[in-house]
Each structure stands twice: as structure tokens, then as C-alpha cells.
């Protein structure tokens, strides 16, 4: 099978190529050609501790003037002194944010104790406790980091987690929502200050490097070439009968990947890859053979409603179908909720309804996958690249618009956004495209700085001529919606929205900013022997 980046591919060929992938294709060797560290836009990958500005002495006013919250910044940094090093100010801002978040976490814990175990309010407050705890861990990890891109990703995740906490409380109809929101406001502002200090004071080389012909090339595939640490079979023929049991056996302190093989079968369980389960690699016998279907979680919060929830960093999933349970009600349930950093899905089928993929935070790659969904298909505030995949839009049960992406970037310095690259967007074959033509949009502005880029992709005639949507013109001045070299009946841009924030990219160097190399720094990930030929640049 020719690599996807070497030829034009039709929707039918793309589907065929994904399905014929072998049952347990585990790579045993890789030859890396032209692997060059990714270069992000301003504030991208680079050595944080080695940056010459780290020890520069600056005035506190000069630092805070470059943030969006001057008053909170001055209140937090002024005690350090009128002049100090960037390192000192950054440390103070981080510590101030952690202090505010610790107070909020304790408040969530105390308030949760006042509700019954099955109440949505208690679940939402417990979710907040977890999300704020994760935020504190992210902030504590920033100063030791060597990579500016990693630091920006961590602080961007903090902003996403804070918003997810508040969204959950609002969803639960928590009576003290306004009070909790006010209590979290200071930490939200200080997290933005931390991100601004990193972004404004640790710029990297912005020179656009074209690496379109540089990719990691696999030397060989070998079925069963790597012995899994854990094997799962529903029929009892393997060591474990459930995926949960295999994950519970995760050996903390393991060096390298923890490999789980999931034999063909339908697994009706909700899988959670916990924060402390890093480098988990899970593979199956194919998207139609190994299927995780989940169980009904209607009476829980959005944060908990997912068939597969991956939190531990560097999670990889290949050759598996993931879907929501058939009996899930009108409450949106994600097939995949992903907040694992440097995570990848390869040759997977993700089949859901509303909010099919909840890309909550951090950086992810979906490569050569099928994604089925309806209404709000992909949401969250991650830096997500969907590459060489097929997005199938299904008919809504009610006359509402299909929105393919709802990207939740709320701070202009976050390194997050959704990129659909070299992919195919079509209507479900069981529906006439005419039914969807006036109802399907590439994306919607849901936050002030929402960002979605669709490039080098095939767009079917289901796409509305305007292309993009907004609620009451919200965000149209500041979002980033862009297209580059798309094709197909839905790719015509002459009738697209006339917004200041919508762009048809014409310069190759501008498009390069959104490749897997530049946008999520995929060349630095440990994927050499797992997900097939990795194209990091443009396809044309």
C-alpha cells in the first residue's frame, strides 16, 4: 500500500486502505529520515532554561503591560520587586496561580460533601477538584521544562481545565455557580498572565522551514513482532477479560511503552487511561473486529461521559473501533475524550453522535481514522491535527445544523486549535447529500479566539456555501478560520463568510504553520515504530 502522502486518494480508497490494515501490525524497526525538531510560531519549541531572556532583568510594569490582566499581574508580581529577572517573575506568577487554585480546589471538595453521591452537583464539583488538581500539576511542571512548546501546552491545558470545570458546574445547575466562578476568576487571570510571560519573553526562531518531504519512514512491519505486556480477550482466551483489568495491571515505573493487545470482540466498558498511566499503547485486530462500545453514562457529567477517556500522556491507540453505546439518550456522549499530551490515534474508527470527539486539552494526532458524527462533531481546546482521515457527517434527528468543529480557544496566546489536513469530509452514504447541504459547517465560533484550519482536503457538497458559522456574530472579529488548497464541490470559497477573521491562505509559508510538524511538533514525539509513515509537512 502506497503511503498516503504520495498520491491523491478518493474517499472510497481512503476507507479501503484503513480497513485492510493488518490485525496486529506492530512495528519492530524504523529508519528515521530527515528528522528535524519542529519549530512552532512565536513561543514555540526551544530550550526554556537556555533562552537568553530567562535571566534578563525587566521592570514589573514592562512585564505586566504585555498581559491581558494588568491589575492582577501587578498585584501578583509587585511584591517580588520593581525589577527582577523574567525567571523570577514567571516563578512568582506560577506560584500565585497555584495558590489561588489550591483555594478553589479545597472549596470544591468541601462543597461536594454537601450533596448526595448520585447528584450531578456532587459529580461536577468532584470533576472540578480533579481538573484543578491536574492544573496545579501542569503549573508545577513548567519551570523544569526545557521546551517552550511543552510549557505553552501545559499552561494552555490549565486554561482549558478551568473552563471545563465551570462548564460542568453550569451543566449541573449548581446553585452556587456564580460564587464559584467569581472565586476562580483570579486564578483564570493569573494563568493567562503565566502564558503571556512565556509567550512574550521566550520567542523562538519564526523562520518557516518547509519539511514537506521529510517524514519518518518505517522499514518493516511484522505481525506479532512485539510481545504485549497484557493481552485482553472477552472470551477468556487471554490473560485479562477486560481492558480495565489490563490497565489496572499497569506497572508504574515501567520504562518505555506499556503494550496492550485487545483481541477481536465487542467490549462494553468505559475505558479510562488515568493520569499516572503514561506511554500506554493499545492495539486491536481492526476497526470492525475490536470494538469498544462503552456503557450508558447519561446520568453523569460531560467530563465523565465518554467511551474512552485518555488522560495519561503519550497514549497511542491503533486498529480499534470506538463507539458510543446504542442506547445512549439525547445527552451528548463522546466516543473519545482525550486530554493526553502527544497522543495519537491511528487506523481507528470513532463512531458517535453529538460531541463525538472531545479533544479537551494538550496535543493530539488522528491519522488515517474514520470519524462518524452529527451536530457538534469535534469539540474542545486541544491542539489537534486530523490527518489523512475520513469525516462522515450523519443526518441529525432534528433540523439543526451540523458543525464539524467547535474549537474552544479562549486566550489568544494558547497554542491550541484544530487542523483538518489532507482528509475527506463527506455525508453519510445512507443520506442524500442534498439533505445536509444547507446544514453543515466546517466550524463555529464558540470562544473569542476559536481556531480551525482546513487544508489540502476534499470537501463534499454537504458543506454550506458560507463554510463557517457563528452565534449572533460572536467571535467573528478574533477567531482564526482558514482554508488552504481544498478541493471538491464544498471547497469553493467565493461565497464564504465575509468576516475579518476568515482567511483563504494563499502563501505556502502561512500554511506550513499548521502542519503536524509546526503546530503540534509531532517530529519530537515517540511514534517512530507505531503509526506508520509520518508526514509532518504539506502534501503538495
Question: What do the predicted segments below correspond to?
Answer:
Residues 105-112, 143-146, 166-173, 198, ...:
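Long, hydrophobic, amphipathic alpha-helical segments used as structural scaffolds
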Residues 63-67, 74-77, 83-155, 159-162:
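Extended, amphipathic alpha-helical segments that serve as helical scaffolds
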Residues 3-4, 12-80:
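Terminal alpha-helical segments
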Residues 15-17, 136, 140-188, 192:
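Amphipathic alpha-helical hairpins/coiled-coils and adjacent low-complexity
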Residues 74, 147-169, 365, 449-463:
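Hydrophobic/aromatic-rich, well-ordered segments within soluble, folded domains that form packed cores
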Residues 103-107, 142, 161-172, 429-431, ...:
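Extended, well-ordered alpha-helical segments in internal regulatory regions
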Residues 2-3, 9, 13-21, 48-50, ...:
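Sequence-level preference for short, compositionally simple segments enriched
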Amino acid at each position: 500500500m502506497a503511503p498516503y502522502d504520495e498520491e491523491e486518494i478518493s474517499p472510497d480508497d481512503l476507507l479501503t486502505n484503513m480497513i485492510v490494515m493488518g490485525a496486529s501490525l506492530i512495528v519492530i524497526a524504523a529508519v528515521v529520515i530527515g528528522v528535524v525538531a519542529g519549530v512552532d510560531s512565536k513561543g514555540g519549541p526551544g530550550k526554556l532554561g537556555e533562552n537568553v531572556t530567562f535571566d534578563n532583568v525587566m521592570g514589573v510594569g514592562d512585564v505586566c503591560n504585555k498581559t491581558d490582566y494588568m491589575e492582577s499581574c501587578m498585584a501578583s508580581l509587585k511584591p517580588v520587586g520593581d525589577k527582577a529577572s523574567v525567571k523570577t517573575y514567571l516563578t512568582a506568577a506560577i506560584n500565585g496561580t497555584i495558590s489561588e487554585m489550591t483555594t478553589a480546589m479545597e472549596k470544591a471538595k468541601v462543597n461536594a460533601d454537601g450533596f448526595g453521591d448520585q447528584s450531578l452537583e456532587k459529580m461536577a464539583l468532584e470533576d472540578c477538584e480533579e481538573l484543578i488538581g491536574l492544573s496545579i500539576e501542569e503549573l508545577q511542571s513548567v519551570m523544569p521544562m526545557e521546551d517552550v512548546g511543552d510549557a505553552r501546552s501545559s499552561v494552555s491545558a490549565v486554561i482549558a481545565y478551568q473552563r471545563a470545570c465551570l462548564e460542568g458546574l453550569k451543566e449541573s445547575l449548581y446553585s452556587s455557580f456564580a460564587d464559584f466562578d467569581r472565586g476562580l476568576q483570579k486564578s483564570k487571570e493569573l494563568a493567562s498572565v503565566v502564558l503571556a510571560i512565556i509567550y512574550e519573553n521566550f520567542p523562538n526562531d519564526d523562520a518557516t522551514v518547509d519539511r514537506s518531504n521529510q517524514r519518518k519512514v518505517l522499514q518493516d512491519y511484522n505481525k506479532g513482532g512485539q510481545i504485549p505486556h497484557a493481552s485482553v480477550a472477552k472470551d477468556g482466551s487471554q490473560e485479562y477479560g477486560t481492558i480495565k483489568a489490563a490497565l489496572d495491571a499497569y506497572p508504574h515505573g515501567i520504562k518505555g511503552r506499556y503494550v496492550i493487545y485487545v483481541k477481536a470482540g465487542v467490549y462494553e466498558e468505559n475505558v479510562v487511561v488515568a493520569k499516572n498511566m503514561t506511554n500506554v499503547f493499545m492495539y486491536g485486530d481492526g476497526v470492525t473486529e475490536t470494538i469498544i462500545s462503552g456503557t450508558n453514562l447519561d446520568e453523569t457529567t460531560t467530563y465523565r461521559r465518554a467511551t474512552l477517556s485518555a488522560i495519561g500522556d503519550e497514549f497511542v491507540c491503533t486498529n480499534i473501533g470506538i463507539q458510543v453505546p446504542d442506547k445512549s439518550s439525547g445527552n451528548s456522549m463522546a466516543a473519545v475524550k482525550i486530554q493526553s499530551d502527544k497522543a495519537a490515534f491511528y487506523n481507528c474508527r470513532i463512531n458517535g453522535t453529538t460531541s463525538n470527539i472531545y479533544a479537551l486539552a494538550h496535543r493530539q494526532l488522528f491519522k488515517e481514522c474514520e470519524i462518524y458524527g452529527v451536530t457538534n462533531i469535534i469539540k474542545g481546546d486541544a491542539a489537534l491535527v486530523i490527518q489523512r482521515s475520513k469525516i462522515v457527517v450523519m443526518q441529525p434527528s432534528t433540523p439543526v445544523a451540523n458543525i464539524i468543529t467547535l474549537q474552544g480557544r479562549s486566550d489568544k496566546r494558547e497554542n491550541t486549535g484544530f487542523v483538518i489536513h489532507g482528509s475527506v469530509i463527506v455525508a453519510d452514504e445512507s443520506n442524500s447529500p442534498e439533505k445536509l447541504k444547507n446544514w453543515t459547517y466546517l466550524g463555529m465560533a464558540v470562544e473569542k479566539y476559536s481556531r480551525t484550519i482546513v487544508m489540502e482536503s476534499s470537501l463534499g457538497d454537504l458543506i454550506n456555501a458560507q463554510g463557517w458559522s457563528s452565534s449572533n456574530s460572536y467571535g467573528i472579529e478574533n477567531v482564526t478560520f482558514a482554508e488552504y488548497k481544498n478541493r471538491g464541490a464544498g471547497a469553493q470559497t467565493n461565497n464564504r463568510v465575509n468576516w475579518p477573521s476568515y482567511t483563504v491562505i494563499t502563501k505556502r509559508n502561512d500554511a506550513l504553520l499548521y502542519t503536524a510538524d509546526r503546530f503540534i511538533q509531532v517530529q519530537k514525539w515517540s511514534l517512530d515504530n507505531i503509526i506508520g509513515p509520518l508526514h509532518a509537512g504539506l502534501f503538495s
